[in-house]
């Protein structure tokens, strides 16, 4: 958004400090949303393309199918989000994609006991950060960061600042 600056009437080449800082904030926002998008599009594949997940011989073929489907879906959504961020200049939908991705994790975790799901497989290994399951810790942190970025995006959109 452009903010009209009266000083430009006297000096057309003059640019206010607010106008200079806006592109910096917008670029920061786009880079931050990009980092999170790459996180949810790439990190699950790195974490799950091994013998504890997708190549786990104890998983049924159908479970492995769903695992591969999830990884392809996450990567595809991330590619669309990157297109929206850098070509369409839109961060709102990519932020929504990230929040939906995280919501899927939390729904699966909360309802896990009803369908026999668990955060860690018996033949897997549990990683913790500060005493919390590493996924819970990381997804909580990313969720808070996404909400902060959403607030920043709304501020820039409404005020141009």
Task: Label the model's feature ranges.
Residues 126-143:
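Individual transmembrane alpha-helices with interfacial aromatic-anchor signatures
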Residues 6-38:
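Cytosolic juxtamembrane helix and N-cap/initiation of the first transmembrane helix
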Residues 49-63, 117-128:
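Membrane-interface interhelical loops and short amphipathic "cap" helices
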Residues 39-51:
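Alpha-helical transmembrane segments of multi-pass membrane proteins
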Residues 72-80, 139-151:
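Hydrophobic cores of alpha-helical transmembrane segments in multi-pass inner/ER membrane proteins
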Residues 42-44, 62-82, 103:
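Core segments of alpha-helical transmembrane spans in multipass integral membrane proteins
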Residues 152-161:
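Membrane-interface capping segments at transmembrane-helix boundaries
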Residues 79-94:
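Juxtamembrane helix-break-helix junctions at the cytosolic face
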């Amino acid at each position: 958004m452009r903010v009209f600056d009266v000083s430009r009437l006297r000096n057309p080449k003059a640019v206010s400090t607010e106008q200079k800082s806006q592109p910096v904030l917008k670029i920061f926002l786009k880079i931050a949303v990009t980092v999170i998008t790459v996180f949810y599009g790439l990190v699950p594949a790195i974490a799950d393309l091994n013998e504890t997940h997708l190549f786990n011989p104890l998983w049924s073929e159908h479970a492995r199918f769903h695992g591969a489907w999830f990884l392809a879906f996450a990567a595809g959504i991330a590619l669309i989000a990157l297109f929206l961020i850098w070509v369409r200049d839109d961060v709102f939908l990519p932020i929504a994609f990230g929040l939906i991705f995280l919501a899927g994790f939390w729904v699966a975790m909360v309802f896990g006991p009803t369908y026999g799901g668990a955060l860690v497989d018996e033949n897997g290994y549990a990683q913790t950060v500060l005493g919390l399951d590493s996924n819970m810790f990381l997804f909580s942190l990313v969720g808070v960061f996404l909400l902060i970025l959403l607030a920043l995006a709304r501020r820039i959109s409404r005020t141009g600042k």
